[in-house]
Amino acid sequence: MPDLTVSVDVDAPVEQVWAALVDWPRQGEWMLATTVRPTVGTGTAVGDELEALTGIGRVGMLDRMRITRWDPPYRCEVLHTGRVVRGPGIFAVRPHGGGSTVVWTEELDLPLGRLGRLGWPIVRPVARWGLQRSLQRFARWAERYSG
């Protein structure tokens, strides 16, 4: 199962960073071309479900996920259950100096079988760039976050 991990340091305390990270409806303010919303529950407990729509205009991808671990303010794990994005995702927040480090890991079950595995080396750098760029935007946003 291919994985993808990116991280960023944030000049804000763990509790503030966590609150910003799991403010699902506002993720579009920092995540590239994405809107997120809870669909079952509030998105703050194991078993709650979320939908993320990533795209531009009428072209996009729907990512459905279920929260499988909720350990505030340090860790949220989800299971992606959509048609394209499948597998575990992990958001972790750790104290670092006077601030925090956010680590985002995706353990992907690639679609299209062998074709997906063959295409991963081409897709991976683009996916990594998008996640890293989103996390860089998140860091600046989270430092100003007030809920």
PLM features: what roles do these ranges have?
Residues 28, 38-85, 96-101, 133-147:
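Glycine-rich portal/gate segments that line the openings of hydrophobic small-molecule binding cavities
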Residues 5, 37-38, 55, 119-122, ...:
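Conserved short-loop catalytic and cofactor-binding motifs
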